[in-house]
Amino acid sequence: MLDPKIIAQHYIIAALWADAPEGTRPRAPRETEEKALQLARDFLRAIGPKCQEYLKNNTEYSKHPDCRGRAEAAIGHDLWLTSQGHGTGFLDRRALHEDVREFLTGLAQRKEFTLCPEFYRGWMYLQ
């Protein structure tokens, strides 16, 4: 259904955009990519096939130019922002039904979907 690799890629992009120290341009090593991919797979498993289908078919949700029509890009972005407590993310997506926004927010805020970024010598690691 939804591609966890794209979710992981945009999860990392959102992490770098939102939380990298000002004026730096850190990169994500393979270890970070693998952790983000596992998180994306776990998140997709948690939301289930019915919710995945809803997100995939909701063209308004993936309308932002950065998403290029892919719900996975929006999910990765929203998963990072929601799980890190940025006050934005799934709840801001008016294209999603209120029940879906609340369900996804509740999941994203659970401990198993919250990875902490650590920036060290130009690299971002997820713990």
Give the ranges of each region predicted by the language model.
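C-terminal edge-of-domain segments
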Residues: Y125-L126
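Long, contiguous N-terminal structural blocks used for assembly/anchoring
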Residues: M1-A71
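Amphipathic protein-protein interaction modules
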Residues: D42-R121
